[in-house]
Amino acid sequence: NKKDNNGAIEYDKLLIATGSHPVSPPIDGMELSGIHSCWTLEDGRNIVKRAKPGANVVLMGAGFIGCIILEALALRKVNLTVIEMDDRMVPRMMDQNAGNLIKSWCMDKGVNVHTSTRVDGIEKADGGALKVRLNNGETLDADLVISATGVAANIQFLEGSGLETDFGVLVNDRLQSNIPDIYAAGDVC
């Protein structure tokens, strides 16, 4: 690896694997205390502090990551409600039948699951708890709200580079970008 006078590094092949970051949905109240994504160690520690047995927890998102979080929360014996905008759980990976099987399994374990449902807003309630308003008219009490509503690829730094991007770096079936010898892998694609 050699650097030129501008600090650029020469390469034979380049792999871009800069990952992604959590996306916060455009919901009133997302900035309130007690609402966390589950992305960093600090997020995890904050969740553990509030996810005590018997705590009311609302999990927004029932995708792949949301279901991993769901499993961990269920083991902590919280009162868990999952809200998923799509018509089934794990909608990007499962068909209707499989998504409904996961939903039934969760409900058999005592998890409340709302599919085809959106969070319209979150407000502070008395005593530091939260009120989560759903688009179906229901309001949920929550000690903790976790947002697992998706991620966005870390591609901002590629603007003007000539690499073709959409919601991530565009690659072929061999993970090659439109520029020879530049590849991308993981959440950045």
Predicted regions and their residues:
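Structural signature of beta-strand start/N-cap positions in the alpha/beta core
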Residues: 12, 56-58, 79, 112, ...
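Glycine-rich dinucleotide-binding loop and its adjacent helix/turn
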Residues: 13, 18-76, 171-173
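Rossmann-like dinucleotide-binding cores of NAD(P)H-dependent redox enzymes
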Residues: 45, 56, 64-123
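Hydrophobic/aromatic beta-strand patches that form the interior of the parallel beta-sheet core
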Residues: 15, 36, 58, 81-83, ...
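Glycine/Thr-rich phosphate-binding loops of Rossmann-like dinucleotide-binding domains
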Residues: 24-25, 67-68, 91, 142, ...
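Conserved beta-strand segments of alpha/beta enzyme cores
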Residues: 8, 34, 79, 112-113, ...
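FAD-site-proximal beta/loop scaffold in flavoenzymes
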Residues: 31-53, 131-133, 138-189
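Conserved beta-strand-loop-beta-strand element in the redox core of flavoprotein oxidoreductases
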Residues: 1-9, 123-139
